Amino acid sequence: MRRVGGVNRAHTMSFLDRFLIISVVLLASVFPVELFPNTGPVPRGGDGQFSGKQGQVVVVTVPELKEATSVKGKFLGRTVTLFPNPTAGGTGYIGLLGIDLQDEPGPHELTIDAQLGEQTRHFSYQVLVVKEKFAVEHLKLPKDKVDLDEKATARWKAEQEQVRKALAEESAMRLWQAGFIEPVHGKRTGIFGSVRIMNGQPRNPHNGEDIGAPMGTDVMASNDGVVRLVVDHIFSGRGIFVDHGLGLYSMYFHLSEALVNEGDLVKAGQVIGKVGATGRATGPHLHWGMKVNGARVNPYALLELPFPQNPAADRPVLAAPAVPAQEELAPTGVGGDGR
C-alpha cells in the first residue's frame, strides 16, 4: 500500500472522503474549477460553482496574478485569507476556506478581490454548502455538568468572551507547514459535528474530535505556531490554543497538564501537554479542534490538504500518523467547550 507523507493514503482518504476535501483552482483568465480528489465535472454559476460539506476545508488557488499586490476573499462574512503561493513562482495566491459545521445548506457567494495596481478586480463564485449527516449521541452526565447554576453560567460566559477576544488577534503571517499531524495516538471516542443530547437536553454540536488515550500521554502540536491561550475552563478543562497564522487555530482540551506558556513558539510534533480528564469529561482523552477564520472544521481535514511547504520556515515536514479507522470508535469521552 502506497504511503504519502507518512500516512496510509487509502486508509486516510477513506475517512476523509466523508468531508469531500477539495482544492479549487481559480484561474485569472478562464476560471475553471478543479476538485481534490477529482470527482468529475462541476456545474458553473457566476465565475464558477463548487460544493462542499459542512465542516470541510477548501484550498483556494489563484494563479497567474503577476501584478497583484493583494488578494482577499469573503465567504458568509468570514475572511478567506490568501497569500503568495511559493510553488507558483511568486505569481499566484493560495488560501483556505472553511465551511462551518453549522453553515446554512444552500448556495452562498465567495467573492475574491485582487488589487492590480490602482485597479481592483472582482471575482464571484457560487459555493453550494451541502448538509452533512452528523451522528446523534445520547450522553448521561452528572447534573452539575449539564445544568449550570448562576455562578457557573457567568463563569462560562466570561470564558467564551476570553476566547473570542484572543482568537480575534490572529497572526498576520503564515506560520504553519505543509503537513499537519494528529496530536496524539489513540482511538476516536467522539465524532466531529455529532449532535449531543445530554441528560435528555439538546446541546451544541461537537466541534472537534475526541481521541482516547491513557492519562498522561504526550499531546503534540499539530503544526508550527504561537501559543495564544493557556486556560482552565469549566467545560474544556485545561486547554491550549495555538495560532498557526492567517486565521488558522488548533485547540487541545481536557489536558492534565499544559507544558507551554502563552506567547511560546511551538513546532509540529513538539509535546505541549498531557492527556487528562479535566473539565466536562467522562474519561481521559484529548478534544482536538480546528478553526479556519472562525469556521469550526473537522481537524482531520487538515491532514491531507495539498499545501506547499512554507519557505519562511526552517524545518522539514514531519510525517503524520495514520488516521484511526471507523471501527475503533469507543464512547469514553465527552469533550467540547460549549453548552
What are these model-predicted stretches?
Residues 181-321:
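Catalytic cores of peptidoglycan-degrading enzymes
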Residues 36-55:
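N-terminal edge beta-strand
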Residues 94-99, 106-109:
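Ligand-binding face of N-terminal immunoglobulin V-set domains in extracellular IgSF glycoproteins
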Residues 21-31:
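Bacterial N-terminal signal peptides
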Residues 57-65:
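Aromatic/hydrophobic beta-strand junction motif of beta-rich domains
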Residues 45-47, 124-236, 325-339:
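Surface-exposed, glycine-biased beta-strand/turn segments
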Residues 112-114:
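Conserved structural position at the C-terminal beta-strand
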